[in-house]
Amino acid sequence: MSSIHVASMILLLFLFLHHSDSRHLDNVHITASRFSLVKDQNVVSSSTSKEPVKVSRFVPGPLKHHHRRPPLLFADYPKPSTRPPRHN
């Protein structure tokens, strides 16, 4: 792969990680962990082992909104110069 392909892949990965909503990812993680806990409990109840089984329950706290400023558009990046033009 050329360096342009590598740079574009890194940029896409960064943008995906930057724009993915952390609250949405937490909700997905919570539902996935609850689903796996239900499956684990079913497996444990059918087994006859006498070892104490620890089931860690993840209790979500209040979701805090992180105040982030909106990302700049690419059109805003070449910022206009604040220096007055020189008159020759």
Swiss-Prot record:
Show which residues constitute the signal peptide: 1-22
Q: Which residues carry this modification: Sulfotyrosine?
A: Y77
Q: Where in the cell is it found?
A: Endoplasmic reticulum
Where is the major localization of this protein?
endoplasmic reticulum
List keywords of the entry alphabetically.
Answer: Differentiation, Endoplasmic reticulum, Growth factor, Hydroxylation, Secreted, Signal, Sulfation
Q: Which tissues is this protein detected in according to the database?
A: Expressed in roots, shoots, leaves and flowers.
Q: List, in alphabetical order, the GO biological process terms annotated in this UniProt record.
A: cell differentiation; lateral root development; positive regulation of cell population proliferation; regulation of asymmetric cell division; regulation of lateral root development; regulation of root meristem growth; regulation of root morphogenesis; root system development
Which superkingdom is the protein from? Eukaryota
Query: Membrane-spanning residues where?
Result: none
What's one GO MF term for it? growth factor activity
Please list the residues that make up the propeptide. 23-75
Residues with Hydroxyproline modification: P85
- Annotated region Disordered: where? 44-88
Q: Give the CC-aspect GO terms.
A: endoplasmic reticulum; extracellular space
The extra comment attached to this record reads: 'Golven' means irregular waves in Dutch.
The entry sums up its family as follows: Belongs to the RGF family.
What name appears for this protein in its UniProt entry?
Answer: Protein GOLVEN 10
Organism source for this protein?
A: Arabidopsis thaliana (Mouse-ear cress)
- Higher taxonomy: Eukaryota, Viridiplantae, Streptophyta, Embryophyta, Tracheophyta
What gene is this protein a product of?
A: GLV10
